[in-house]
């Protein structure tokens, strides 16, 4: 998965945190690297390249909260939110619909 500690996903999550994929939890395996991480998907059927992976949020009946992640890292959820790096686009949702995507790396800031 192309996200790592340079994006604010802490090394403390190595071998401890889960992500959501197809409505199921998948454990982070190995070390969270600078710009990638790996997860164990052997229990999830038909995983495809480019499937959506949820690091924090809801997928089906499963949910991972920032508070859950903060507990794993020994911090508070506010700190995790502040650590999200500028390489991560911000997606604004209103009424369940995406209303804006802000990519801080784009020159037009659009």
Residue ranges of each PLM-predicted region?
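Active-site anion/phosphate-binding pocket segments in diverse small-molecule metabolic enzymes
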Residues: 1-110
């Amino acid at each position: 998965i192309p996200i790592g500690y340079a994006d604010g996903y802490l090394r403390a999550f190595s071998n401890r945190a889960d992500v959501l994929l197809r409505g199921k939890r998948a454990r982070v395996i190995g070390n969270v690297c600078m710009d990638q991480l790996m997860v164990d998907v052997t229990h999830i059927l038909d995983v495809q390249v480019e499937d959506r992976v949820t690091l924090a949020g809801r997928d089906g009946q499963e949910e991972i909260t920032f508070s859950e992640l903060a507990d794993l890292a020994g911090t508070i959820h506010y700190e995790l939110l502040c650590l999200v790096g500028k390489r991560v686009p911000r997606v604004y949702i209103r009424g369940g619909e995406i209303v804006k995507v802000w990519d801080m790396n784009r020159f037009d800031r659009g």
